[in-house]
């Protein structure tokens, strides 16, 4: 299955409305998948400074920061995100990204939220308004493209 997460008024969701995607690797053991996924994560993150954490072969947590990933007006917004991977024999479950977006404009912090909310509340913006209507189409598309590509690249495992 390809990870095709979309941003909805409730955050990132898969095509069925869930918060995960499952990648099948028939015949591969958990230890093999853990090693391959760990290597893929570390290779793909060259040039950035991600935090990578796993205390066993069951789960990997990756946190990363991408500066100026998207723009709100003239302000480049930094994305801080978490990707989580549950590993089992023959499959890896990738959970929807958890993303915080922030930036600075005229010396003040700007926050952009994925979920529904007021469109303007001081310097806080939302991709969807409180009725669930899309307000930031370009930002939504850029974020979806970035994270779907990121996950697809991470799941290109070499054994």
Task: Please state what every model-predicted region is.
Residues 3-159:
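Ser/Thr-rich, low-complexity intrinsically disordered terminal regions
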């Amino acid at each position: 299955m390809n990870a095709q997460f979309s941003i909805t008024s409730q955050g990132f969701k898969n095509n069925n409305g869930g918060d995960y995607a499952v990648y099948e690797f028939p015949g591969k053991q958990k230890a093999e998948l853990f090693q391959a996924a760990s290597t893929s994560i570390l290779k793909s993150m060259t040039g950035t400074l991600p935090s990578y954490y796993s205390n066993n072969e069951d789960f990997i947590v990756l946190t990363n920061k991408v500066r100026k990933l998207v723009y709100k007006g003239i302000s480049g917004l930094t994305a801080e995100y978490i990707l989580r991977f549950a590993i089992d024999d023959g499959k890896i479950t990738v959970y929807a990204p958890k993303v915080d977006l922030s930036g600075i404009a005229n010396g003040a912090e700007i926050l952009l939220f994925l979920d529904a909310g007021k469109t303007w509340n001081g310097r806080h913006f939302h991709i969807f308004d409180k009725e669930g209507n899309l307000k930031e189409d370009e930002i939504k598309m850029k974020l979806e493209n970035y994270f779907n590509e990121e996950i697809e690249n991470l799941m290109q495992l070499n054994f």
